[in-house]
Amino acid sequence: MFDVSFTELMVIGVIALVVIGPERLPKVARTIGHLLGRAQRYVNDVKSDIRREIELDELRKFKNEMDETARSMQTSLRETEDTLRDSTQALRAELDDTARDASKAVNGADAPAEPAPAVASDTDTRSIAPPAAATPADKTPPTGSAT
């Protein structure tokens, strides 16, 4: 971490022993150990916070990309919907025109300029039809009274 060799640590220990003294050196060493532990935890916390921020930043970028994609899809869907609506309206208008034209043609055919000849009734067809064949009861031989 600090790139300190073993000999440098020995020199620092001897100087601390001379300056602080043998009675207070263990207490100072314990305090320095606690401070170094806190410093390491703080550094680790900062590292994890930085990692978390990087991950959150990546997630934000991903979220922004997804939002942008969703917006473009909505725009595309609206454009497609508008195109379909316009096509449907054009087809309806064309069908309405065709229906009007067909209605005019049918109404024009219903009212001809000359009236059609009257259709013969059922009684008229009987008078035109040939007489019915005689039934077997009618074909009895004549009796002798008819001489």
UniProtKB/Swiss-Prot annotation:
It is found in: Cell inner membrane. This is Sec-independent protein translocase protein TatB. Belongs to the TatB family. The lineage of its organism: Bacteria, Pseudomonadati, Pseudomonadota, Betaproteobacteria, Burkholderiales. It is a single-pass membrane protein. GO terms for molecular function: protein transmembrane transporter activity. GO terms for biological process: protein transport by the Tat complex. Keywords: Cell inner membrane, Cell membrane, Membrane, Protein transport, Translocation, Transmembrane, Transmembrane helix, Transport. InterPro entries: TatA/B/E (IPR003369), TatB (IPR018448).
